[in-house]
Amino acid sequence: MDSLTSILLLLELQHEFSGLKVPGRLAKFGPPFRPSEEFADAEDSPVMKMIAQSYIFTPTLPGVNKAPPEFWSDKLQPLLETIGKHNLSDSYDHGRVSKRKMVGFAVVVVLHVLSKGLLGKATPLSEDRKPTSNNEEEDDADEAKSSNADSSTDSVQKSLANVNMDDANGPERLHYPSVKRLREAYSLLVYGDGLQQALDRISVSEDVDSWDEPLRSVIENIRYTIAVILHFSFVTVDAIPESPHLVSNRKGPEGVVERLYNRIPWFLTRQVLRVGNAGLLMSGLTRLFLMKPLSWFGESRNLLQTMLAGIFNADLEHSESTMVETDAEFEDDAKWETMRKALQWFTQLSRTEQDDVRSQSINKELNITIAILEAYEAQQTETTETEGVDKEDSDKASSVQGNEDEVPDTASETEHSEIEDFHFDPYSEKGVHIAMRYFDAALTHRDRECLIHDLCDNDQLNDVVREFMNAFYNIIYEAHQAADFSQAIYDFQYFLWDVIQLSKAGAPLVKFINLVERYQSCFVRFIHRLVVNAPDLCGEWCDWYRHCLKQFSVEVKTPDAVDVAHKALNTLDEETKHQVLEEIGDYVKELDEESKKAIENKDSTSEWLLHLYNFFGSAIITPTTAHGVPQPQLPNCGMKLNRTKEKLLTPFRNLLMEQLNELQAKNQETPSEMTSTE
C-alpha cells in the first residue's frame, strides 16, 4: 500500500471515529444495529463498517455469535446514542487534549493497522525465498533470549514496584523486533500453518521465548507493543505540561486508573471466582456487581454503578470547588457575572450552535471564552431589542418620570460598576486564564453529570452487562473449568498496581518492557491451561483467528483502496493535486526523521506510535490569550495535512463507499444464483 492510500485511510478513520459522537452514525453501520429514521441523513463510515463486519459481527466470534440481535439494537445502541445526544465537551474548548480524546486517537491508529491489512493484504513469501538474517539480528535475538532466560514461570506473589528494574537481567537497551522477521511471521500466519505451530508449542510448554523464528519475533512484538502503549498512555502524555490556566485534578490516566483500582473489590472478586460450580460463579458475579441493595430512601445503586459514580464524582467535586472559588473571588463583579452567564449559556447549547461559536473562535482568532462572550452579548442584545419594541409604546410615559427619579441612583450604580469592573477584564491575560479555568471546570462538571445520569442513574448499562454475561456464559463455564480465574485476577491486580507505580515515577520505556516481560509468565500460563484443558473452547477461538487472518489474504475480495485513492486524486485540478502530494510527501519525510530521532533516544520507532504522537501533538486547542491563532497541543507539532483533508478526503470516502456497496451487492447475488442453479 502506497503512502497516499495509507495517509488517506488514517485521516478517514479519524473522521469516522470522531463522528461516532454524532447520533445516527452508529445506525449507518447496518445490521445488527437498527436504522434511525430520526438521523437518516447521517454520514456513512465505510472503513469502520467494513472492519466491524469483517472482525466482530461474524458467525465465528465466540460469545458475540450467541448475542441476540436485540442486544445490539435495543440495549447497546440506545445507550451509545443517549451519550452522543448529550454532546460531551470538545478538547478545543478545554485548552488541552482530554483523556477521552487520547483514547480515541489510540483506537484510530489501531484501526488504521487493521484497515491496512484488510485492504492492503499480506504478501505471501515466494517458495524459493529462504528466510535470512544478518549477524546483528541474530545477536539481538540471542541477547533478547538471554535476557529472558531468568524470567520466572512461577506466579507473581508480590508487587514488582519494590523490585529494582535496573538489575543485571534487564535489557540495557531496547530490542526492536525485526521488521523482516515480522513480515515472514505474518505471511506464515496468513498463508501457512503459523497459528497451528503456535498452538502446538504453547500446548507443550509455557516457555514462549524458546520458540524459533519467525514466531518468536511475534512474541517480542506483542510484548514490545503492550509496553509502548502503557508508556505512552501513562507517562508520555502525563509529562506534557498543560496550559497554565488549568488546575489539574491528579492529571494523567494513572489518576483515573488508580481511582478505579481502589474501588474494585479484589478480595471478594477472587473469592467468588473460587466457586467450583460455573452456574454459582455467574450468579455470584451478577449479585456482586449488579444486584442493588434495599434502601429506605429511593432507588439505590449496585456496585458497578457505585464504582463508576465514585470515579465521576471525584472530577465533579473538583470542578464544583473550582467554580465556587472563582465565583467567590469575583463576587458582585458585573463583568465576571456576564462572563459566567455566557460560559454557562454555552454549555447548554446544541452541538450545531456550539460548533458555530467554535468556528468563530478559529476564524476570528479569538480565545473560546471571548468568542462565547461576544456570541452571548449579541444574543442578549437581540433579545433585549425584541422585548423593547413590544414594550416601547406602553412604557413611554412612565419611563420619562421614572428616569427623572432614578438619575442619581443610575449614576451611582454606574460609578460602582466601573470600580468593580476594574477587578476582572475578560480581554486581559489574567482574565482569560480565570475564564478558561472556570470554563474547563464547567464543561467537566456538565460532562460528569451526563455520564452519571446515563451510566449510574438508570439501568441501561446494567442491562448491557447482564446480556453480555449471558452471551458469554458457555465461554466462562469452559474457561472456569480449565484455568484458575482467581489466580489470574490476583496477577492482574498486582500488574495494574505496578503500572500505576511506574507511571507515578515517570519511568522510561525500558522499565515498562521489563515489567511486561516479568508478568508474561502469568498470562502465558493462563493461555497454556486453556489450550490444554479446554480444547473445544480453544477450537472455537482458533476458528475466529483463522477467519481474521484470512481477511488479510489476497483470496478475500475487498475494495481496491489504492485504486480508489488515485481515482479520488484525479478528480482534483493539477494545482490542488500538486499541493496534496507535496503535503503527503512532507509528512512521510517527517515520519522518517522522527523514527531516526526515536532510535537515538531509545524510544519506539513503530509507525502507528508516530501517528499517535502526531495526532496528540497536532490537536488544535484554543489560544491562551484573548486574541491569537489556535495552536497545536505541542509547539511546532502539526500533521500539516489540511489541504488533503479539505479537498481529497470526501471524494475518497464517496468512491470507497461505492466500491464497498458494489462488492456487497455481488456477494448477496452469488448465493441466490447458486440456489437458482441448483
Swiss-Prot record:
Its main location: cytoplasm. One of its GO terms (molecular function) is phosphatidylinositol binding. Keywords: Cytoplasm. InterPro entries: LEC1-like (IPR047168), LEC1-like_C (IPR024554), PX-associated (IPR024555). This is Uncharacterized protein C663.15c. It is found in: Cytoplasm. Residues 123-156, 381-417 are annotated as: Disordered.
